[in-house]
Amino acid sequence: MATTIQREGLPHREIHEVHRIDHDGAVDADGHILEPPDLWDEYLESKYKDRSLRICLDENGLEELEIGGERSVMSRRGFPATLGAMGAPDLADIQRNPERTYLHEAPFGSMDPLQRLEVMDAENLEAAVIYTTVGLLWEAELNDPELSQAYTRAYNRWVVDFCRDSRSRLIPSAHLSLSDPEAAATELRRAVDDGAKGCYVAPFTHSATPLGHPKNDIVFRTAEELGVPFAIHPTFEPQWTKGDRMGSWENVKQLRLTASITASDGVRHQFTTLFD
């Protein structure tokens, strides 16, 4: 039986070495946070809490993701602890060592908005657009539109709360799931009304429907009407997408992802002000 990890305060690590930007007014356009491990237990509607997104301990004491009540098959045991340690030389040890945990390895400023502002001051950053981290992992394994929408609503409520008292320096971007375009459009309106300043989606749908398909027009139209930016963020993806739809990770970095959606599907021509 997996044991759910709960938050016991925030990480207490010291601020890490930072690179200070010489020029004033810079904005971090890809400012990821690490979600508190009990975020979905706290913010998910009651009817879904038995299938909450969780970080649990396996029988060997290693952390793992639990998605929709099932063990993650794409995130290896011990993987959660590595999420805050990108580029670390001892990444393999982090993943194999039960004493090195998601909370223990979380960098200063990754879960606490006041700490994040302190890091930004040290870096001379004016603002940061906030994106999810754990949220980039679950959608590839959850082919349940209703629960997917519930997961995004929970995260969006939390991230707006995270950013709320930052004097507009922390800019929340809402996570949308195109598993149900009408529900996603409704959530975008709710999230923006609550304080979100933009939105993003995964680069795939479980139905294999292209993101630029007319059935998703309601989401693009809503973003355009609200005057908020719409982003497509790389995520974990189902195995069927590998090497078939967009090619390699290099292709994503070369913006073929955006080009294929906006050009071939005509989104750029139909929703003109969305690209202003």
Per-region residue spans from a language model:
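Helix-coil boundary/capping segments in enzymes
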Residues: 1-276
